C-alpha cells in the first residue's frame, strides 16, 4: 500500500516543541521512551513491541494486521486487533499522564496507526544514521579527522544490542541483524580513519574486542592487521592473520578473502602500506569548539584531541 509522506501538520496539527518535541525514542539498546530525561513505563513486552514496530516505521502508517502478525506471528488470538488497540490506548495514556498530548504523537489512521516524530533528533536511530552518513562522506573525501568526529558521534547513540529487551520477537531479530551490520561498518571506518590519523594504538584494543565478538568479519581483521603493522608490531599483525585463517578454516572451511591474503604477504615482505592506509588531506575539525572550524592540517598535538572512544 502506498504511504503518504509525513507532514508535521498531518491530522493532529503541528508538534508542540515544548511537549511532543521533548519526547525521545531509543531503539539502539533496550526500548526507551524518555521525556526530558525521565524514562516512561512502557508496559508488557507485547505492548512495547507494538511501540517498537511503530517506531521502526516512524511517520508511516503501520496496518493493524501488520502489528498483529509482528506480535503473535503465526498464532494470533481471536481478539488480537482489539488487544493491539488496547496497547495503543495504554501508550497514549502513558504519554498523557506525563503531560504530553498523545494526539500529536500516536494517531489512528486507516488501516492502522502512525507514530509521528517531527525532529530526527528525537530518535537515536535517526541520529546514528545521520552521523554515520556524514562520517562516511568525510572519510571518502580524505577528511579523516572530521570522519572520526562524526563516526564516533554515531556510535555514542548505542547503549547495547538493538531492542535488547525484545529479542524474542522475530521482527526485532531481523532488524537487529541488519543494523548490526551498519554498526560494524562504522567501527571499521572509524578504525580506518584513526589509523590514517596516526592513532592505530588507540583503536587496536577495541578492534581486538570486536574481532572476538564478530570473528568472521574480515574487514575488522584487516584494520587490526593494518593497525598492528603501521604501529610497528609486525609479529602481532602476522598473528592476527593466522588467528583469522584458523577460525575460518575450522568453523567455515574457507580461506581468508584475497584482499586479506594480499595484505598478509605485504606484511611478510615489510612493504609500505600507502595504498591501504588513507592520508589526511585537509579539513581537520577543531574539536574544542561546537561545530568546529576547518584548518589546514593535522598536527601531532592535535591527534590527542581526536574523540575516539575506543580505548
Curated annotation (Swiss-Prot):
DNA-binding region: 15-117
GO biological process: phosphorelay signal transduction system; regulation of DNA-templated transcription
CDD domains: BTAD
UniProt xrefs under InterPro entries: AfsR-DnrI-RedD_regulator (IPR051677), BTAD (IPR005158), OmpR/PhoB-type_DNA-bd (IPR001867), Sig_transdc_resp-reg_C-effctor (IPR016032), TPR-like_helical_dom_sf (IPR011990), WH-like_DNA-bd_sf (IPR036388)
GO-annotated molecular function: DNA binding
Pfam family membership, one: Trans_reg_C
Keywords of this entry: Activator, DNA-binding, Transcription, Transcription regulation
Function field: Acts as a positive transcriptional regulator of the molybdopterin biosynthesis moa1 locus, promoting the expression of the moaA1B1C1D1 genes.
Other notes: Identification of single-nucleotide polymorphisms (SNPs) between the attenuated M.bovis BCG Pasteur strain and the virulent M.bovis strain AF2122/97 revealed a E159G mutation in BCG_3145. The E159G SNP was found to be present in all BCG strains, but absent from virulent M.bovis and Mycobacterium tuberculosis strains. The SNP in BCG_3145 was found to have a subtle effect on the activity of MoaR1, suggesting that this mutation is not a key event in the virulence attenuation of BCG.
Stated family: Belongs to the AfsR/DnrI/RedD regulatory family.
Protein name: Transcriptional regulatory protein MoaR1
Chain's gene name: moaR1
Amino acid at each position: 500500500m502506498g504511504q503518504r509522506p509525513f507532514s508535521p501538520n498531518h491530522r493532529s496539527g503541528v508538534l508542540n516543541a515544548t511537549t511532543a518535541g521533548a519526547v525521545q525514542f531509543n531503539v539502539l539498546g533496550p526500548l526507551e521512551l524518555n521525556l526530558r530525561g525521565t524514562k516512561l513505563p512502557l508496559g508488557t513486552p507485547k505492548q512495547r513491541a507494538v511501540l517498537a514496530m511503530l517506531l521502526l516505521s516512524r511517520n508511516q502508517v503501520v496496518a493493524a494486521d501488520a502489528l498483529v502478525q509482528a506480535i503473535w506471528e503465526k498464532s494470533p488470538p481471536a481478539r488480537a486487533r482489539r488487544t493491539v488497540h488496547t496497547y495503543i490506548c495504554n501508550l497514549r495514556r502513558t504519554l498523557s499522564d506525563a503531560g504530553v498530548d498523545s494526539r500529536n504523537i500516536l494517531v489512528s489512521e486507516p488501516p492502522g496507526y502512525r507514530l509521528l516524530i517531527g525532529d530526527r533528533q528525537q530518535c537515536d536511530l535517526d541520529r546514528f544514521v545521520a552521523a554515520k552518513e556524514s562520517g562516511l562522506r568525510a572519510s571518502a573525501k580524505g577528511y579523516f579527522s572530521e570522519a572520526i568526529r562524526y563516526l564516533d558521534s554515531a556510535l555514542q547513540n548505542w547503549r547495547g544490542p538493538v531492542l535488547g529487551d525484545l529479542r524474542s520477537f522475530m521482527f526485532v531479530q531481523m532488524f537487529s541483524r541488519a543494523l548490526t551490520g551498519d554498526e560494524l561498518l562504522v567501527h571499521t571506518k572509524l578504525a580506518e580513519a584513526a589509523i590514517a590519523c596516526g592513532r592505530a594504538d588507540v583503536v587496536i584494543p577495541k578492534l581486538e574486542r570486536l574481532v572476538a565478538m564478530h570473528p568472521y568479519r574480515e574487514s575488522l581483521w584487516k584494520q587490526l592487521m593494518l593497525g598492528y603493522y603501521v604501529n610497528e608490531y609486525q609479529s602481532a599483525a602476522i598473528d592476527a592473520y593466522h588467528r583469522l585463517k584458523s577460525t575460518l578454516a575450522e568453523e567455515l572451511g574457507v580461506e581468508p578473502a584475497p584482499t586479506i591474503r594480499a595484505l598478509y604477504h605485504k606484511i611478510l615482505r615489510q612493504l609500505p602500506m600507502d595504498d591501504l592506509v588513507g592520508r589526511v588531506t585537509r579539513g581537520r575539525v577543531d574539536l574544542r569548539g561546537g561545530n568546529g572550524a576547518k584548518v589546514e592540517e593535522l598536527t601531532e598535538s592535535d591527534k590527542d584531541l581526536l574523540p575516539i572512544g575506543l580505548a
